[in-house]
Amino acid sequence: MSTLTGKVAVVTGASKGIGAAIATQLAAAGASVVVNYASDQAGAEKVVKAITAAGGKAVTVKGDVSKTVDAQTIIASAITNFGKLDIVVNNSGVYQFTPLEAVTEEIFHKQFNVNVLGTLLVTQAALPHLGKGASVINIGSLVSRITPAASSVYTGTKGAVDAITGVLSVELGPKGIRVNALNPGMVDTEGARSAGFIGSDFQKEHVSSTPLGRGGEPIDIANAAVFLASDDAGWISGQLINATGGAR
């Protein structure tokens, strides 16, 4: 079983959904966790309360990952509260499916700023504190492989995350830092529900073509993240790990 005892992790966008599940499972495996949120303070505090009630250690920190100062603040929280940093999970993400004719500069920049620039800025801020054995996990998406219609901007961001993961694995590998992407299929989260994906024809089609015959749950992604964060995955870097129930 993967153990993270003595490790310190930062999880961005961790007030709900996949991020909350990852933060909770990292803590359950023994890590001290910084739970980042951009606006949902109540959600982040709920995650921390659950972690501490189970005997774990966690704190919240507010920050917009697409802002350099905020990215630095997020990382500083780990050092201030726990004295070091071993694991970075770049989970913050926004999405809006939009057909080409409706794409605007605002739609483009909002998604690329959070999903791509945010991944770079948080990792950049973390780098001075990461040493041999550290793990960076970028949360991508199956969309970069299946390229659904009306998702050119969102899919573009996740394709960029895939590419950045490969580049950083080469760049940071000599320092002993592993970098991987964890790419979920459709997962039942608050965001997926509010976007109308859960229960939609698109979701039903996706599940019917998934070899394991079901959609994903946040815990499915969180368990994979714990493994990638652990020393059990010490020889894995530069990989795109598809957590999709076999869908591709």
What are these regions (language model features)?
Residues 146, 226, 237-248:
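Short C-terminal tail/terminal secondary-structure segment
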Residues 128, 170-174, 234:
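Alpha-helical segment proximal to the catalytic Tyr-Lys
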Residues 123, 157:
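Active-site helix of classical SDR
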Residues 174, 186-210, 220:
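A glycine/serine/threonine-rich, flexible loop-to-helix segment
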